């Protein structure tokens, strides 16, 4: 099956904390890990691993190069990803010792999609002009 996914790309910054911050608090985290994320990225990788021919379309900004690499290494076609000089989307995720999380999203280039870009992607995909 041939799948087009026009989906989000985020860098996930996961901070392990003993408890969530409260207003006015400043604390050090116990650790920091960086992951590839975004619902769109996760869906594209899962669909490719399931044996589908997947094409991912998105706008990718500064700081997100690893996201395109992760997609490509998972067998996802990344030819329709448009580069941008703006900052890519990211998530700041606090995870406490019980595994609960608190997430702050920055949309970044995920919010810069234009009608023209979407129309171009759909035309290329529909006409096999990839």
Predicted regions span which residues?
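Positively charged, low-complexity intrinsically disordered leader regions
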Residues: 1-23
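Short, composition-biased local secondary-structure segments
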Residues: 10-17, 36-40, 115-118
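Conserved functional loop/turn residues at catalytic and ligand-binding sites
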Residues: 10, 75, 96
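Conserved phosphate-binding/catalytic loop of the ribokinase/pfkB sugar-kinase fold
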Residues: 56, 81-83, 93-130
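Short glycine- and Lys/Arg-enriched binding-loop motifs that mark or flank ligand-binding interfaces
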Residues: 3, 20, 33-36, 57, ...
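Substrate-binding N-lobe of the ribokinase-like
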Residues: 23-90
């Amino acid at each position: 099956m041939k799948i087009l996914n026009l989906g989000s790309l985020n860098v996930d910054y996961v901070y392990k904390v003993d408890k969530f911050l409260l207003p006015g608090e400043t604390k050090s985290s116990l650790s920091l890990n960086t992951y590839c994320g975004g619902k769109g990225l996760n869906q594209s990788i899962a669909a490719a691993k399931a044996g589908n021919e997947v094409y991912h379309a998105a706008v990718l900004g500064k700081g997100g190069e690893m996201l395109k690499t992760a997609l490509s290494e998972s067998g996802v076609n990344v030819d329709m990803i448009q580069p941008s000089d703006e900052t890519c989307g990211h998530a700041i995720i606090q995870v406490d010792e019980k595994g609960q999380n608190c997430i702050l999203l920055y949309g970044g280039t995920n919010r810069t999609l234009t009608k023209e870009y979407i129309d171009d992607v759909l035309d290329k995909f529909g006409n096999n002009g990839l």
